[in-house]
Amino acid sequence: MIYTISLNPSMDFIIEVDGLEKNSKNRMTSELRVPGGRAINVARVLRRMGMPSVATGFLGGHTGDFIKEWLNMEGIQTSFIEIDDETRINIKLYNKNIVINGKGPNISFNEQTELLYFISRIQEGDTVILMGSLPPNVDKDILDRII
């Protein structure tokens, strides 16, 4: 099995505007919300290639529910650790090449431990894909502990 691990996934809110003027109300001409994050994108591509995978990592709140439901709707198996904080939202102004990334949720010690326990049960011969940024309060040594 292939496991894609997202420590700081997002809901990407992609909007298009005709113009962008400071100190003015700017109207969107289109909008789209999709699951985001490098490892989640890999899981989505694997699914399109007919390769099963399990998307895991941290998800919380309404945005986390949105991501999980979307992935399940696409036929991607999920096994995320539910967190108390809200999964981040990234804003992308499509035709202006502007990206504003949310910082991400705070992940408790217990939530981190739960993910590490899940990862410890991955079988030899399985593939792990770990991609993306770290949530703000997660120390980078978690990467060593995962590997």
Model regions and ranges:
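Conserved beta-alpha-beta core of the PfkB/ribokinase-like small-molecule kinase fold
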Residues: 127-147
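Short, solvent-exposed amphipathic alpha-helical segments in soluble enzyme
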Residues: 19-22, 71-74, 145-146
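Glycine-rich phosphate/adenosyl-contacting loop at the front of the ribokinase-like
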Residues: 1-56, 66
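Glycine-rich phosphate-binding "P-loop"
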Residues: 27-32, 102-104, 131
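Cofactor-binding loop segments of dinucleotide-utilizing enzymes, especially the Rossmann-like FAD-
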Residues: 5-9, 58-61, 83, 133
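Residues at secondary-structure transition points
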Residues: 30-37, 86-88, 106-110, 141
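Conserved N-terminal subdomain of the carbohydrate kinase-like
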Residues: 48-127
